[in-house]
Structure formats: structure tokens, C-alpha cells
Amino acid sequence: MKIFFIDNFDSFSYNLVYELECLGYEVAVYQNDIDPSYLMGLMNEEPKTPLLFISPGPGNPNSSGNLLKIIAMAKKKFPILGVCLGLQALAQSYGAKIIRSKEIVHGKATTIALKKHAVFKGLGESMVVGRYHSLMASGLPKNLEVIAEHDNIPMAIVNEEDKILAYQFHPESIMTLQGRALLEQSVGFLRELS
């Protein structure tokens, strides 16, 4: 499965690209100012359904170039995996609000509660993750299932019908001890849905 990676001009982007390449995936990186129609054309040319990966980034979904337009065009056509800003943008695309979190965290290890779900198979009932965010998704609609949370902050969301999966935390962070395994299971899960 080829991964089309949207870089939201974030310093963590290439850490994620590296992790995905270590797992054996071909990764093509595009910045969030790419023309959405051009990107969809490239993705449609792939012989096998590719995955769209939305990176972390500064700011909020509304200040992230063409990100929301890209999501609107890709949703329900391609599997999408988002991290941090990626979760916020996906949640907003379903009608959630993005609000300031009670706690601003930039490099904090946090234990989060995991619900039983295929992406967490073998990872336990909780997980230590690296968090870097001041915003959070709020008022999620029923078609976005929260599968991990901390202090009422959605840490992982999924919509299996639309092939959407996203994490508020950073799987590539050194603080996320099982991050590579989680990334591998996440891409595998979305590939099976495609």
C-alpha cells in the first residue's frame, strides 16, 4: 500500500515518514498547500488503493492550507490515518468543534485508556503515549467512535465505514513506547477495510 503523506509543515513529519518507511511502506510526501484536485488525481492513478496520512502541525485545521479541502475530497474514497492536527481536522470534517484543551502539553508522557479494538490488539488496556497539543476535538458526532481517551480528551477516533482512524497523540514519539507496533497495526487495519 502506497502512502500519500500530507505534511502540515511540522517538525515531526519526517519522524513519521521514517517510521512508515521502516515498516516497508512507500511514502510520497506532499505539503498541505498542494492543489487537492491534483493530489486526488495522483491517488486515483495508483493500481492499489493508497492511504492518505495527515501529519501533525501547528495551528488549527482552518489555518492549515488546503487540508480541509483535501479531506473533503478524499473522505469515503480512500482510507485516512491522522495524527494530532490530523485527528482534529478529521473530527472537524464530521462536525466536531476544535477547542482549547484544559491542559497545554508539548512533550508529555501520558497513560491513556484503550477500548477493545483491532488496532490495539496485543497492546494492553492502557498505553503510555507522547502528547504535544493545546487543542482538542469536542462534541464528536456519533459516527466517530472514541476508542482511546484521557481526561475526556479523545485520544483515538475511528469510523470504520469511512475508513478513518486518527490519534491525538504522536505514535512516532520516543515517549510512545509501542508506537511502531501501533502504526503497523493501524495501516494494516485500514488496508483490510479498503
From Swiss-Prot:
GO cellular component: cytosol
Catalytic activity: chorismate + L-glutamine = anthranilate + pyruvate + L-glutamate + H(+)
Glutamine amidotransferase type-1 domain segment(s): 2-194
Domain of life: Bacteria
Biological processes annotated in GO: L-tryptophan biosynthetic process
UniProt xrefs under SUPFAM superfamilies: Class I glutamine amidotransferase-like (SSF52317)
Record: residues binding L-glutamine: 57-59, 88, 134-135
Disulfide bond positions: none
Active site: 84, 170, 172
The keyword Amino-acid biosynthesis belongs to this UniProt entry's keyword annotation: yes
EC number(s) reported in the record: 4.1.3.27
Gene3D superfamilies linked to this entry: 3.40.50.880
GO molecular function terms attached to this record: anthranilate synthase activity
Pathway as given in its UniProt record: Amino-acid biosynthesis; L-tryptophan biosynthesis; L-tryptophan from chorismate: step 1/5
The keyword rRNA processing belongs to this UniProt entry's keyword annotation: no
CDD domains given in the database record: GATase1_Anthranilate_Synthase
Quaternary structure and partners: Heterotetramer consisting of two non-identical subunits: a beta subunit (TrpG) and a large alpha subunit (TrpE).
Stored NCBIfam families: trpG_papA
PANTHER family noted in UniProt: MULTIFUNCTIONAL TRYPTOPHAN BIOSYNTHESIS PROTEIN, MULTIFUNCTIONAL TRYPTOPHAN BIOSYNTHESIS PROTEIN-RELATED
Functional summary from the UniProt entry: Part of a heterotetrameric complex that catalyzes the two-step biosynthesis of anthranilate, an intermediate in the biosynthesis of L-tryptophan. In the first step, the glutamine-binding beta subunit (TrpG) of anthranilate synthase (AS) provides the glutamine amidotransferase activity which generates ammonia as a substrate that, along with chorismate, is used in the second step, catalyzed by the large alpha subunit of AS (TrpE) to produce anthranilate. In the absence of TrpG, TrpE can synthesize anthranilate directly from chorismate and high concentrations of ammonia.
Protein name: Anthranilate synthase component 2
Source species: Helicobacter pylori (strain J99 / ATCC 700824)
